């Protein structure tokens, strides 16, 4: 039996940092593979917050719920601006 005066240590392993771009890529692929229109489904999720817009295929629903919807929108806006507006 351990002595009651000793302190036990509990170490929590750091979760790998989630990259929003990678989440979007995986979700897009999963939705496409299941035959859904990925744009409609992702927009539905962003607008409503309802995760049932996203398939469970490839763990996409769980992944997308790990990032904030505003972070997804921000990533999409950065991509659009960088690739369409800054070139003009």
UniProtKB/Swiss-Prot annotation:
It comes from the Bacteria. Signal peptide: none annotated. Belongs to the UPF0297 family. NCBIfam families: PRK05473.1 (NF003997). This is UPF0297 protein Cphy_2298.
